[in-house]
Amino acid sequence: MGEYLSRVQKLMPLCLTSFTGGSKGNAIPRSCRVNLVAMGIHLERINEIAQTLQEEIRAEYDEPEAVIQAFDVDALGGNSLTTESTAKVISLLCSAPNGVQKWSSDIPGLVQTSLNLGIAKLGDRFSATFSVRSSVNAEKKELLEQLRALAGMLDGTYSQDGEYPAWEYRKESHLRDTMVPIYRELFGAEPRVEAIHAGLECGLFSERLSGLDCVSIGPDILDIHTSRERLDIASVQRTWRFLLEVLKNL
């Protein structure tokens, strides 16, 4: 949406009258809707820009169902932003870091540091909520400082909440080495041992208890942190059996 508004803004000043995108801070938004006043530009031209960007997104991100459309609506009323404030919102959307920032040097293919813009909305004021994740605390702090600096440059304010500590990967783990053969014996298959890029309770526990050896297990969850998230019920029973057997052997 930021890219779309930026392209329209290059042709004519804009005033945002409403902005709604995303519903959860830690999830990638599925849709975004904006009402605006475009002074002196016809709807046909705006739709041409939308169509061009839609084709680019479908090709670049392999999203054949991605849709960008413009409609002629009554955009007046509500909390309309000035052209200057609208320009700052567009600058934020286009300039803020987003997505993968660094990959792990220990585990190929593992994201080490990332963030996403989860919620953006215009109420009494415009607000944007980012979720920042990293398995290295120093990198997370650096990314948070980038967001703080960007807010300051655009005459905005910055606040932070819901922080959880990083859970750094341990190359040696007695608990992990104990659980692998138990899984193999129970299910006749090789367990898939992975490091993941997510905020988990293990990070909180390991921060409080120095040297804690911990492993995260759970049932199969598909399309996590999206509107299509769902749980495989049969895997819940398998996880319970596995947990009981691990506890017997500790």
What are these regions (language model features)?
Residues M1-V132:
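Midchain, well-structured core segments that form catalytic/ion-binding scaffolds
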Residues G2-L11, H42, E84-C94, Q101-K102, ...:
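His/Asp/Glu-rich mid-to-C-terminal helical/loop segments that flank catalytic regions of hydrolases
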Residues N26-R33, G78-E84, E168-P181, L204-R208:
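Short glycine/threonine-rich loop-to-helix capping motif typified by GTGT followed
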Residues S105, Q112-S114, G118-S127, S131, ...:
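Zn-dependent metallopeptidase/amidohydrolase metal-coordination segment
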Residues R125-S134, Y158-P165:
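Short, flexible active-site loops
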Residues T129-D155:
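C-terminal, non-catalytic macromolecule-binding modules
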Residues S135, A166-R170, R230:
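Short, contiguous acidic/charged loop-to-helix segments that flank catalytic cores in large enzymes
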Residues G152-L186:
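Generic long, charged, amphipathic alpha-helical segments
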